[in-house]
Amino acid sequence: MAVTINFESDTATGQTWNRPNPNGNNPPTSLSGFATATQYTSQQFFVDTSGLYNFFSKSISPDSWDNYTYLYQNSFNPTTPLANLLIGNDDFSNTTGQSGFNNVSLTAGTQYFFVNTGFTNNDFGTFTSSITGSGNITLGNVADVPEPVSILGTLIGTIYGVGLSRKYKHLKKTTKV
């Protein structure tokens, strides 16, 4: 059963970068010569199941601004836009205003960044995106999710603390008599 997560954002208030050039290679190997100050947003996410995932983004407003999407693994730094870049796409299914890629192999527990930007410096606006795959997709930083051992340690500490508190209250009652 496929799992899908949807989110909406806006590049109009985003920072700018020199986006990678599509040049037919994936991952792209050069920077654009004309999209040198393009606004972007980056959405961190991770998956809990390794497998193939699909990505789709559609521009909303202004109508059909020409969006472009990229996928990064481990980290994303707009000052080094070719580092950690896995794939980029413009005009998904040859449709301006839609971008994405299918059957991208992701690894469970790895941090990824889905970047939405414009094709040119004048392309920006709101968009909706979706990520679909076989596992749960969590928006955010993988480092913010506690490890099971941490959860167990917290639970044991809480139980121990409650036990000590009850013992202290019991001792307090018996010493008053």
Place the predicted regions along the sequence by residue.
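Extended, low-complexity, turn-rich repeat/linker tracts enriched in Gly/Pro/Ser/Thr and Asp/Glu
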Residues: 60-66, 122-123
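A short, hydrophobic C-terminal helix/tail in secreted or cell-surface proteins
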Residues: 146-166
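C-terminal membrane-anchoring or membrane-association module
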Residues: 162-177
